[in-house]
Amino acid sequence: MALIKELLGKSPQIGENTFLAETATIIGDVTMGKDCSIWYNAVIRGDVHYIKMGNKVNVQDNAMLHCTYQKHPLNIGNNVSIGHNAIVHGCTIKDNVLIGMGAIVMDDCLVEENSIIGAGSVVTQGTHVKSGEVWGGVPARKIKDINSQLLEGEVNRIADNYVKYSSWYKENVKHIEG
């Protein structure tokens, strides 16, 4: 069972059909939509501001979601994949977005719908990623416009796959002593 904690009178609200890995941590003012999945060692800390997540959001292994005290909440839309080891902090992520493995999205950023942040990228504070763009690098910059192959083949495929993977874990995982 995941570590789920109330803090300062605020408890996480977990959406229906959501998978929580047993080593995931969810604290405080966190609201999730349905069909989400929070994977191993992912941390979602709604301790200093709120975190709102839409439907079909997957937060992959070792990812960190946080906010800035009394300044920047974290809002995440629907059909969003947050890759392994990514950090998403006090920003707004719209619908149909892929945040690549190890990417960092900092305070007060806006990532509009149908966009990709490449693996290992650092999206610096206050950056605005427009709809349909692919960004990468350190600091991140626009690389190209997204096309239908990237949208269907990456953004939607990964989000759909994580709904499928979470069903495997809910139905088939067996604890082995040892």
Roles of regions detected by a PLM:
Residues M1-Q13, D47, M53-N55, D61-M64, ...:
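Glycine-rich hexapeptide-repeat left-handed beta-helix
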Residues A2-I38:
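N-terminal segments that cap or nucleate solenoid repeat domains
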Residues S81:
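Short proline/glycine- and basic residue-enriched helix-capping loop/turn segments at helix->loop/beta transitions
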